[in-house]
Amino acid sequence: MKEKRDLKIQAIENGTVIDHIKAGQALNVLRILGISSAFRATISFVMNAPGAAGIKDVVKIEGKELSVEELNRIALISPKATINIIRDFKVVQKNKVVLPSYVEGVVRCINPNCISNSSEPIKSKFSVLQSEEEGVTLNCLYCEHVISENIAENLL
């Protein structure tokens, strides 16, 4: 007899649940959101959990509703993620992340000669494109360098 296995993460009273994160990307989602050990709210996450659509990660952030801008940056590494806003243990809002057309100060340009990598106080700026064949592609607005792989490795 096949045993049923459920994904068990404690429910949160108020906060944000980020579901359907690309497998193995939960820690990078936390990096994108600027969440570190100094963050004082409760964070729960599961990596490589089985789901109906395959393997996924899930992140729960207690007591904090993230801004639309924060959430949409997640689309850089997990364009199919969904966001659930929780109040009194109930989902009151559910949205898919939206890939922004532009990001600033989120990703490091891979071109070592780019002005954003110099000692000048200039934040990196990228236009963001998505295609079925290539996935997410970032184009540096300063040097026109393209990042289409390993975006997570270049997060600031």
Curated annotation (Swiss-Prot):
What cofactor(s) does the depicted protein rely on? Zn(2+)
> What Gene Ontology cellular-component terms does the record carry?
aspartate carbamoyltransferase complex
One protein family per Pfam: PyrI_C
Taxonomy, superkingdom:
Archaea
InterPro entries in alphabetical order: Asp_carbamoyltransf_reg_N, Asp_carbamoylTrfase_reg, Asp_carbamoyltrfase_reg_C, Asp_carbatrfase_reg_C_sf, Asp_carbatrfase_reg_N_sf
Q: Does the keyword Zinc apply?
A: yes
Q: Where does Zn(2+) bind?
A: C109, C114, C140, C143
GO aspect biological process, one term: pyrimidine nucleotide biosynthetic process
Q: How is the cofactor bound?
A: Binds 1 zinc ion per subunit.
Q: How does it assemble?
A: Contains catalytic and regulatory chains.
NCBIfam families attached to this UniProt entry: ATCase_reg (TIGR00240)
Q: Which family does it belong to?
A: Belongs to the PyrI family.
Free-text function comment from the UniProt entry: Involved in allosteric regulation of aspartate carbamoyltransferase.
Name of the protein this chain belongs to: Aspartate carbamoyltransferase regulatory chain
Species whose genome carries this gene:
Methanosarcina barkeri (strain Fusaro / DSM 804)
Taxonomic lineage of this organism?
Archaea, Methanobacteriati, Methanobacteriota, Stenosarchaea group, Methanomicrobia
Which gene holds the coding sequence for this protein? pyrI
